[in-house]
Regions:
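Vicinal oxygen chelate
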Residues: 1-5, 10-20, 49-50, 67-115
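A short beta-turn/loop motif at secondary-structure boundaries
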Residues: 41-43, 66-68, 104-109
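Short, flexible, glycine/charge-rich loop motifs used to bind or transfer phosphoryl groups or to couple energy/partner
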Residues: 4-5, 65-67
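Short beta-turn/strand-loop junction motif enriched in small, turn-promoting residues
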Residues: 33, 63-65
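Core segments of cupin and vicinal oxygen chelate
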Residues: 6-8, 16-57, 85, 92
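Active-site loop/turn elements of alpha/beta-hydrolase fold enzymes
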Residues: 40, 80, 102
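Conserved beta-strand in the GNAT
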Residues: 59-61
Length: 115
């Protein structure tokens, strides 16, 4: 069986909820980040901005649920070689997963698959 660590390539992005996406984008642009992608998460009805500085990517998204949490890290995404294999390894290894299957969002050219 493949080792879990062998499937992880590095950090993919950090998810950051915000009540004011434009203010958040302006803040990070002031730090030298550039907008790599602006899109909408249709399923959640949220505006999304991916902000990049060198190898660091932040996914900022406007949500009505950020009250009292603005600026808090919501998720950290790891870049993996095979998301399906890692999902099975973690599920079968007894890890508590939030999703029953790998999910998809139509971000970027090929989309984003996650769990």
């Amino acid at each position: 069986m493949e080792k879990i660590a062998e499937t992880i390539n590095g950090l993919q992005h950090i998810g950051l909820p915000t009540n004011d996406l434009e203010k958040t984008v302006a803040f990070y642009e002031g730090l030298g980040f550039s907008v790599a992608l602006r899109t909408v998460n249709e399923a959640a009805g949220e505006q999304v901005a991916f902000l990049q500085l060198k190898e660091l990517m932040i996914e900022a998204y406007q949500t009505g649920r950020a009250a009292g949490r603005a600026g808090a890290v919501d998720h950290i995404a790891l870049d993996v070689a095979d998301v399906d294999t890692l999902f099975v390894l973690l599920r079968d290894g007894g890890y508590e997963l939030l999703d029953d299957a790998v999910r998809f969002l139509p971000f970027w050219a090929r989309g984003v698959r996650f769990f």
